[in-house]
Amino acid sequence: MANKKIRIRLKAYEHRTLDTAAEKIVETATRTGATVAGPVPLPTERSLYTIIRATHKYKDSREQFEMRTHKRLIDIVNPTQKTVDALMKLDLPSGVNVKIKL
């Protein structure tokens, strides 16, 4: 292939789902003969939301909700056409956001 590296960035709210998706990608790429670097765990993005429990008053009574976004990075070095075809046909778990950069 003309490009020597494929960079795959994965995002998910559940780290177990993310790790299984990364494991499937790494196993598929190594099976087709490409060199794999990763998965590299990137920093977890944490969003915290604070709301008032009551509808009208009692401002001191609040509730906090947290949302964590886990991220992984996988580099596939020297991919073959067979590697690209296998990655296109790969079925990943739902809830995993995949960004591919060539």
Curated annotation (Swiss-Prot):
Q: Does the entry feature the keyword Ribosomal protein, yes or no?
A: yes
Do the record's keywords include Ribosomal protein? Answer: yes
The molecular function terms in GO held by this entry are: structural constituent of ribosome; tRNA binding
Cysteines paired by S-S bonds: none
Question: Taxonomically, which superkingdom?
Answer: Bacteria
What the entry lists under PANTHER family is as follows: 30S RIBOSOMAL PROTEIN S10 FAMILY MEMBER
Which function does this protein serve?
Involved in the binding of tRNA to the ribosomes.
Listed NCBIfam families: PRK00596.1, rpsJ_bact
What name is this protein filed under?
Answer: Small ribosomal subunit protein uS10
Species this chain originates from: Streptococcus equi subsp. zooepidemicus (strain MGCS10565)
What gene does this protein come from?
rpsJ
